Amino acid sequence: MMNRVILVGRLTKDPDLRYTPNGVAVATFTLAVNRAFANQQGEREADFINCVIWRKQAENVANYLKKGSLAGVDGRLQTRNYEGQDGKRVYVTEVLAESVQFLEPRNGGGEQRGSFNQQPSGAGFGNQGSNPFGQSSNSGNQGNSGFTKNDDPFSNVGQPIDISDDDLPF
């Protein structure tokens, strides 16, 4: 038999990190996963999947993911039950995550709190100051660099980006 779940989605809120009485870390979070098809109004609906992860990975999830972070979860489906406060049996189905992949840079979601892959400023470009294209700031577009002002993909930096609400899963 096979019980395997692979999900990619965005966290609906910050992960909840707790510790068992024995000191084992456990984090819970909910992942919003877009469905592959649109409804009759042309909108893509999302499923909200509860996930649980244990030990060091739970601490990493709590430290490095936050609401809106894009994550990949690999795990298995589990159902557990307990007796609620009203005496009735409560059943919970959730994904027991074996691994969680962080699928975007730390600063990609807005707030910057560091990154696993963060490189020193100017890495890969030598000591060129703030101009990553290797030209001095006052040299203009000399020679045959092949890079004109109209080709600059970052020329609109600082201006709002036009993103439809339909493109956001939350």
Curated annotation (Swiss-Prot):
SUPFAM superfamilies, per database record: Nucleic acid-binding proteins
Q: Which UniProt keywords apply?
A: DNA damage, DNA recombination, DNA repair, DNA replication, DNA-binding
The residues forming the signal peptide are: none
Renumbered to this chain, motif Important for interaction with partner proteins spans 165-170
Q: Does the keyword Repeat apply?
A: no
Biological role: Plays an important role in DNA replication, recombination and repair. Binds to ssDNA and to an array of partner proteins to recruit them to their sites of action during DNA metabolism.
Q: What is this protein called?
A: Single-stranded DNA-binding protein
From which source organism is this entry? Bacillus cereus (strain ATCC 14579 / DSM 31 / CCUG 7414 / JCM 2152 / NBRC 15305 / NCIMB 9373 / NCTC 2599 / NRRL B-3711)
